């Protein structure tokens, strides 16, 4: 009896973890509602890339005014487990004279779940190759790349290999920059749930526990993270929770690649701080952190002090957590506009909104 019960439970969990056509349709619906809640008009398509004949899910918001003619565009890259709809509060503001694009990186979200190399360095280069194929297919000459968390790591890796295609890097609470240090040496203590997630990542794919919860996941995550509803309002209370659940339900090939890039508790095996100064000095970079984020801005400060004859800007948005772009979209969008419109020599000194460190 016990064996039969166990087999039934395992079968139920395996069924929960299957991404069906209905799951795909539900993901499309809740994503659409998140865009609709912010009144964002967008185009969605799948962009083919060479790597294992994959397709990169992409959304585009056209400029409100005359589009620039130099082939530049703004590109948002979401963090681990996130998707294009996380930036709905930013698209309209940023799409003034530039087309704004966002994509789910290959292996994540609504993109193909292609398998990457088990070698972390090779997997990183494969992801960079996919980004470059995507850029070519989109017909973009240069990109203002806005990467959040793991998206910031990917943006930096791309800039190392393709600096001539980067107009500016905007790295939002980027993951993977710091070298591993002892817990007692950390300047900022991470939230308990972040420490838990980092610990789990050492043994399982990061979002495996959520997949095991099956259809109960949205309700459980809502109990654990009620703040997400405030940051990412949809037309219905469960939209953001269903979105994150369905995004991470398919075969987790991207998560597996990420896990291969990490040490226990989420440190990067190849921290970007050791490599960042290899990026061409003509590529400007703006770091944006939330004052309440658990990510340490120390690596950005180190880069600022050592990256001579290059533009490095550090902004800390007061009252914001790691999702700076959602916690204070007005301040975030203003920073992005300053970068895109070339107001780099005059960073804001309005400390009621943000604290700024700047080197030029």
Curated annotation (Swiss-Prot):
Pfam families: Abhydrolase_1. Coiled coil: none annotated. Disulfide bonds: none annotated. Acts coordinately with atgl-1 within the lipolytic cascade to distribute stored energy to tissues during nutritional deprivation. This is Abhydrolase domain-containing protein lid-1. The keyword RNA-binding does not apply. It comes from the Eukaryota. GO terms for molecular function: carboxylic ester hydrolase activity; lysophosphatidic acid acyltransferase activity. Disruption phenotype: RNAi-mediated knockdown suppresses fasting-induced oxygen consumption. It is found in: Lipid droplet. GO terms for biological process: lipid catabolic process; lipid homeostasis; phosphatidic acid biosynthetic process.
């Amino acid at each position: 009896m016990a064996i039969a019960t166990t087999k039934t439970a395992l079968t139920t969990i395996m069924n929960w973890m299957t991404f069906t056509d209905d799951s795909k349709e539900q993901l499309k619906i809740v994503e659409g509602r998140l865009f609709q809640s912010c009144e964002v008009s967008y185009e969605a398509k799948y962009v083919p890339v060479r790597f294992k004949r994959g397709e990169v899910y992409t959304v585009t918001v056209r400029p409100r005014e005359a589009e620039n003619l130099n082939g530049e565009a703004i590109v948002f890259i979401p963090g681990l487990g996130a998707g294009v709809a996380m930036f709905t509060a930013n698209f309209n503001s940023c799409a003034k004279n530039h087309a704004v694009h966002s994509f789910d990186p290959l292996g994540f979200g609504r993109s193909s779940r292609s398998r990457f190399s088990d070698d972390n360095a090779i997997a990183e280069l494969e992801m960079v190759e996919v980004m470059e194929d995507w850029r070519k297919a989109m017909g973009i000459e240069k990109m203002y790349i806005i990467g959040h968390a793991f998206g910031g790591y990917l943006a930096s890796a791309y800039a190392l290999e393709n600096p001539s295609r980067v107009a500016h890097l905007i790295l939002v609470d980027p993951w993977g920059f710091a070298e591993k240090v002892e817990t007692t040496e950390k300047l900022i203590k991470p939230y308990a749930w972040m420490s838990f997630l980092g610990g789990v990542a050492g043994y399982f794919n990061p979002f495996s526990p959520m997949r095991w919860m099956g259809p109960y996941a949205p309700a459980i995550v809502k109990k654990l993270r009620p703040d997400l509803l405030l940051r990412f309002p949809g037309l219905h209370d469960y939209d953001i929770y269903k979105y994150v659940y369905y995004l991470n339900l398919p075969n987790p090939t991207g998560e597996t690649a990420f896990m291969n890039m990490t040490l226990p508790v989420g440190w990067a095996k190849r921290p970007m701080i050791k490599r960042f100064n290899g990026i061409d000095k003509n590529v400007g970079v703006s770091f944006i952190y939330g004052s309440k984020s658990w990510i340490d801005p120390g690596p950005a400060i180190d880069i600022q002090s050592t990256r001579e004859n290059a533009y490095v800007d550090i902004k800390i948005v007061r009252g914001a957590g790691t999702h700076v772009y959602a916690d204070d979209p007005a301040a975030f969008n203003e920073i992005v506009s300053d970068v895109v419109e070339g107001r780099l020599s005059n960073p804001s000194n309005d400390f009621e909104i943000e604290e700024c460190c700047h080197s030029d």
